[in-house]
């Protein structure tokens, strides 16, 4: 279904503006957000600038290097693997469609417009999808969501009141570990007391044995 929706957007952008508005209005009326089931949203991803996301080729190479076996497996691994499979297939079909349109449109301006639309607009959406799911598999969903919220707060804060550098995703797990370590002594406070209470018993038993 997702592939059908993406191809419909491209096909409706060619004939007339009216047909394009009808198709896009029908799709937008469904209020489909591919990130909702993962705790994120299109709006949350939009805080990241377009040049933040690697190229599709780099993202595909990363996904293939890290998760090729799982992606090619007939088994259901996780929702992120399934979403990655769909995004990769959608991009392949979009490339085939752009190639076909580019070869069959006689008007060079229209041909360039369609190819540019696929590469820029749809390309950005696919880059966002690939980055999100690869990052969730690599760093964990909670870490990625924490990063998106942190970056959203940072980018919306006036420059005079925010750190000079934006948050970095790869450093968030280290920060999370530090926070967990900082909280752990509070949970483990009873353990030293138990050890202390047990030590006199051992000493008493040893003294009794020595007396016997």
UniProtKB/Swiss-Prot annotation:
Transmembrane portions of the chain: none
Function: May regulate immune response to the intracellular capsid in acting as a T-cell tolerogen, by having an immunoregulatory effect which prevents destruction of infected cells by cytotoxic T-cells. This immune regulation may predispose to chronicity during perinatal infections and prevent severe liver injury during adult infections.
Short name of one Pfam family: Hep_core_N
Major localization listed first in the record, in broad terms: secreted
Post-translational modification: Phosphorylated. Cleaved by host furin.
A GO CC term assigned to this protein in UniProt: host cell cytoplasm
Residue spans of biased composition, Basic residues class: 178-205
InterPro entries named in the record: Hepatitis_B_virus_capsid_N, Hepatitis_core, Viral_capsid_core_dom_sf_HBV
Subunit relationships: Homodimerizes.
Protein name: External core antigen
Matching Gene3D superfamilies: Viral capsid, core domain supefamily, Hepatitis B virus (1.10.4090.10)
Superkingdom of source: Viruses
Family: Belongs to the orthohepadnavirus precore antigen family.
GO molecular function, one term: RNA binding
Sequence repeats: 184-190, 191-198, 199-206
Signal peptide extent: 1-19
Alphabetical UniProt keywords: Disulfide bond, Host nucleus, Host-virus interaction, Repeat, Secreted, Signal, Viral immunoevasion
Record GO biological process: microtubule-dependent intracellular transport of viral material towards nucleus; symbiont entry into host cell; viral penetration into host nucleus
Region Disordered: start-end pairs: 165-212
Ranges for region 3 X 8 AA repeats of S-P-R-R-R-R-S-Q: 184-206
Site entry: Cleavage: 183-184
């Amino acid at each position: 279904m997702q592939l059908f929706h993406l191809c419909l957007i491209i096909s409706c952008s060619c004939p007339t503006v009216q047909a394009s508005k009808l198709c896009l209005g029908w799709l937008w009326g469904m209020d489909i957000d591919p990130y909702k089931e993962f705790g994120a949203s299109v709006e949350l991803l939009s805080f990241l600038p377009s040049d933040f996301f690697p190229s599709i080729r780099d993202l595909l190479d990363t996904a293939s290097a890290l998760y090729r076996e799982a992606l090619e497996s007939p088994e259901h691994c996780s929702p992120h693997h399934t979403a990655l499979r769909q995004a990769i297939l959608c991009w392949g079909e979009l490339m085939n469609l752009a190639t076909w349109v580019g070869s069959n449109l006689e008007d060079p301006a229209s041909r360039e417009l369609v190819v540019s639309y696929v590469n820029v607009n749809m390309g950005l959406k696919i880059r966002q999808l690939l980055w999100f799911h690869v990052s969730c598999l690599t760093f964990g969903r909670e870490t990625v969501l924490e990063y998106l919220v942190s970056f959203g707060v940072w980018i919306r804060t006036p420059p005079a009141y925010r750190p000079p550098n934006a948050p970095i995703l790869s450093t968030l797990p280290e920060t999370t570990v530090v926070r967990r370590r900082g909280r752990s002594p509070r949970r483990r406070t009873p353990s030293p007391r138990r050890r202390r209470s047990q030590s006199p018993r051992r000493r008493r038993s040893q003294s009794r044995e020595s007396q016997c």
